[in-house]
């Protein structure tokens, strides 16, 4: 069961995560127990984040070794707001690259680009990373940053 705290209700968090087309930052442990951070495209539904990445990516190896993570999805321009938390991950084949295709639609507006064609090529195997949050904390500095120009 996910615990939601902070500035927003669970419904407001879910709305933000569905609408914000910015990467999720995942922090995990490397096998030597040092920390590693990676930014990935995500989709949020049914209380979980789903990402897709190359099966040979370092983060896949790290998550196979230790599934515990911390995460953040936040704006880079004022007014600053977002969510952070922790949880665990599970890995599976991204069958038919379904998650990747959805992410290409979400972040690039479709699959008609050189990047999309490369990511969808037959010789690339993709892994779905599912993030199961335990704790989600939201913050929103909109009120305190009134009058600050936005960069978005």
Predicted regions span which residues?
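Short, basic/aromatic recognition patches
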Residues: 1-25
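Short, surface-exposed beta-strand-loop junctions and turns on beta-sheet-rich folds
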Residues: 57-59, 78, 145-146
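A short, polar/charged loop/turn motif at coil->beta-strand junctions and beta-hairpin connectors
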Residues: 16-20, 79, 125
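Short, intrinsically disordered, mixed-charge
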Residues: 64-69, 105, 109
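Structural motif corresponding to alpha-helix initiation and N-cap regions
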Residues: 10-11, 56-57, 113
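Charged, gly/pro-rich active-site loop segments
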Residues: 1-8, 81-152
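A generic structural signal for nonpolar/aromatic side chains embedded in well-ordered alpha-helices
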Residues: 16-17, 63, 103, 131
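Short beta-strand segments
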Residues: 21-55, 61-63, 69-73, 82-85
